[in-house]
Amino acid sequence: MGSADERRFEVLRAIVADFVATQEPIGSKSLVERHNLGVSSATVRNDMAVLEAEGYITQPHTSSGRVPTEKGYREFVDRLEDVKPLSSAERRAIQSFLESGVDLDDVLRRAVRLLAQLTRQVAVVQYPTLSTSTVRHLEVIALTPARLLMVVITDSGRVDQRIVELGDVIDDHQLAQLREILGQALEGKKLSAASVAVADLASQLGGAGGLGDAVGRAATVLLESLVEHTEERLLLGGTANLTRNAADFGGSLRSILEALEEQVVVLRLLAAQQEAGKVTVRIGHETASEQMVGTSMVSTAYGTAHTVYGGMGVVGPTRMDYPGTIASVAAVALYIGDVLGAR
């Protein structure tokens, strides 16, 4: 790229930075005063004219200044060289806050609250998707000789408890056998494979009497746990931050709030996050949703080195501190994965 193009990008970068900070359209005079661009105000005016002709900035009808367009923000994000690093104190605080979570629900609630505070945007965290979860442990506890409590724990920390009513009583030896049979069928398997395994057990042993009947009944109940609750869930935090930026959305704030409440659009965008550590920025129409026009979404996946648990990120106006937001989303995702993976 030639020097004139590089200079114009520096002008664009300055316009984005100032507009994000001030919410006011930016003129050439203020750019020269605030930034060491090394050229005259006349040159900056010419560069702004070129940027406007190429669709990177535009002039609000009520102002003599310019503001970035979606195309301008995209160019700015694509050419980001430095993402604002979090301080070591901030990183330690994030890690400590998340590690204090008592279970999966608490960790994710803490994460969404923390991300909303860090970015001053709406934070969204998807519950771990069942399709990628692995059964870490199955516990079977006798409440009575004919009534069992089964607890399924996944690698992401998801816990599901089910009661099994047996047709007959079983003794401690049979309980140990039942626990071993079910554990071998489930533990270490992806939930999709585990559901097939218990379905086979249920069909083979259901109604066989004694231990076989107990295994069949338990497998049938487990199948409900593994298969029936596949709906995706989303946690939201900081929704009030949208109203703080209401002027950025024009008249579309209501439709944005409705999209967040319905969750379908956000879950679709988060479902595309398949790689932990990679942050995706969607600006304006890139969300492919009319309800989300005027917003940007910065998102990533969280999980371990080998397993993606779900997606997370923030939704806010296109007038967003992209370097700071990208850093915050990446950091919180990293620590969620570490905390859940260590449990």
Swiss-Prot record:
UniProt cross-references to InterPro entries, sorted A to Z: GAF-like_dom_sf, HrcA, HrcA_C, WH-like_DNA-bd_sf, WH_DNA-bd_sf, WHTH_transcript_rep_HrcA_IDD
Gene Ontology cellular component terms for the protein in this record: plasma membrane
Residue intervals passing through the bilayer: none
Keyword set includes Transcription regulation: yes
GO molecular-function terms, A-Z: DNA binding
GO terms for biological process, alphabetical: negative regulation of DNA-templated transcription
Signal peptide start-end: none
Misc note: Was identified as a high-confidence drug target.
Annotated function: Negative regulator of class I heat shock genes (grpE-dnaK-dnaJ and groELS operons). Prevents heat-shock induction of these operons.
Family to which the UniProt record says this protein belongs: Belongs to the HrcA family.
Protein name: Heat-inducible transcription repressor HrcA
Species in which this protein is naturally found: Mycobacterium tuberculosis (strain ATCC 25618 / H37Rv)
